[in-house]
């Protein structure tokens, strides 16, 4: 039996609609109105991707969550943690990745964190370094392993992503293939 969300849609149908929403975010130019590097900006992205699909789209979670034995930031301290993350510097690639890792540890939403946060990361990279990650060249296995280890040491993640940076920040093919790859990381496959 397919897993369902609170509104009663299958995960596959949620992923398909959310992927459509992600493409529309870029095609419409709405991406240019997103706050860059802030919690509010991440909430805007999440709401855009998952609005109408999840009741909690764009809302900071109030429950504790874990994945694969890893507990994300305690809900009791989450808002305070997000303020501190938002204040982290974004001047260098290393600082940006450190901020990305902390946002991943915070995991502010009940679902859809990875897909939203990768778009958020690219916006921060684009604004500050005039680069984005060419996600289609980033191995799912290597990326997930690096993310799993990143709370202890983000060196592996930095090397993996730095090797796949591009200054072709407005290339639609790179953007859309990257979005599809991002959904693939989360288990989505067409068909």
Curated annotation (Swiss-Prot):
Q: Which reaction does it catalyse?
A: L-tyrosyl-[protein] + ATP = O-(5'-adenylyl)-L-tyrosyl-[protein] + diphosphate; L-threonyl-[protein] + ATP = 3-O-(5'-adenylyl)-L-threonyl-[protein] + diphosphate
What do we know about how this protein assembles, alone or with others? Answer: Homodimer.
O-AMP-tyrosine PTM positions: 183
Q: Does the keyword Nucleotidyltransferase apply?
A: yes
Q: Which protein, by its recorded name, is this?
A: Protein adenylyltransferase NmFic
Query: Per the database record, which ranges form the Fido domain?
Result: 37-162
Residues noted as binding ATP in the record, renumbered to the chain: 67, 104-107, 112-118, 140-143, 186
| Miscellaneous note of the record | Defined as class III fido-domain containing proteins, in which the inhibitory helix is present at the C-terminus of the Fido domain.
List the InterPro entries. Fido, Fido-like_dom_sf
EC number per UniProt? 2.7.7.108
Reply yes or no: does the keyword rRNA-binding apply.
no
Query: Which top-level group of life is the source organism from?
Result: Bacteria
Reported modifications of this chain: Auto-AMPylation at Tyr-183 in vitro.
Functional description taken from the UniProt entry: Adenylyltransferase that mediates the addition of adenosine 5'-monophosphate (AMP) to specific residues of target proteins.
Q: Which GO terms describe its biological process?
A: protein adenylylation; regulation of cell division
Query: For the motif Inhibitory (S/T)XXXE(G/N) motif, what are the positions?
Result: 182-187
Q: Could you tell me the keywords of this UniProt record?
A: ATP-binding, Nucleotide-binding, Nucleotidyltransferase, Phosphoprotein, Transferase
């Amino acid at each position: 039996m397919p897993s369902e969300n609170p509104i009663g849609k299958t995960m596959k149908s949620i992923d398909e609609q959310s992927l459509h929403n992600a493409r529309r975010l870029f095609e419409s130019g709405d991406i240019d109105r997103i706050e860059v590097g802030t919690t509010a900006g991440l909430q805007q992205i999440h709401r855009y991707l998952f609005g109408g699909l999840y009741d909690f789209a764009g809302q900071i979670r109030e429950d504790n969550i874990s994945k694969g034995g890893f507990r994300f930031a305690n809900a009791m301290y989450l808002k305070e943690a997000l303020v501190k993350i938002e204040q982290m510097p974004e001047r260098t690639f290393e600082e940006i990745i450190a901020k990305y890792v902390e946002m991943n540890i915070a995991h502010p939403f009940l679902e859809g964190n990875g897909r939203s946060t990768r778009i958020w990361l690219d916006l921060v990279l684009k604004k500050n370094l005039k680069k984005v990650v060419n996600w289609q060249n980033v191995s799912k296995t290597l990326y997930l392993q690096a993310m799993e280890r990143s709370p202890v040491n983000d060196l592996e993640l930095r090397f993996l992503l730095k090797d796949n940076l591009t200054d072709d920040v407005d290339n639609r093919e790179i953007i859309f293939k990257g979005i599809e790859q991002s959904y693939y990381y989360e288990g989505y496959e067409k068909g």
